[in-house]
Every structure is written in C-alpha cells, then in structure tokens.
Amino acid sequence: MSDIWKEFSWLTISEAAAYLGVEAKAIRSWLKDVSLLALPSPEDGKLRIPQVFLVAAESEGDYRGPLEVLRGTLILLRDGGFSDAEAMNWMLSEDDSLGDTPLNALRAGRKKAVRRVAGALAL
C-alpha cells in the first residue's frame, strides 16, 4: 500500500474552501453527505481532504466541488463496511484489476469498472 500522506496534497476544510472559492460550510456539507471524504492528519489531527478529490472551476459558471462520481463510490464502500481510512487508501492506491488508482479510473470515466471492483471488495 502506498503512503498516501506523502504522495498527495492534502487540504484542511478552510484550505479546500479557499481552493474552490466556496464557504467552509459547503465543504462540511459535502463531507456529511459523503460527497467528500476527509481523514485526520497524522501530524496535527486536523481533518484533511486530498486536493485530487476536488474540481476547481476553470472559468466563471463552471462546476466547482467534489468530483461528481466520487459520492456513489464512497457510499458503496461505506455500505460494504470500509472505514473512512480504508476507503481513502483504496481510492488513492493502485488497484491491479483497474490498472490504476480507483480515483484516476473515475476521472477517466470508468465509473462502472470502479464500482464493480468496489462492490466485489465490499462483499
């Protein structure tokens, strides 16, 4: 398993809000409805979100927020008994059956393949 804390850029709730140009309450709402996932940092215990989970608007009016296909996958993993840490590690670590990280596969439009693997793991 990779060391996700070293391989990715992590943002606090306020940093994620600033990155997206939204209020911190929007980030907390996305965390509550499982559109986003955060883990306590091993360094300071503050909740942190991987920046790669976020979509920043490139121009006025563009979508900004969590990667839209993330929510269904996170719910599937939670329903299957994955802890938040296990779900985060799986999303950010290479999966042999996908040939990539599940997150990269989702970003590439391979939602069905990712959810099929997640469903099999959650059994």
Segments predicted by a language model, with ranges:
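Non-transmembrane "mature" sequence context
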Residues: 1-123
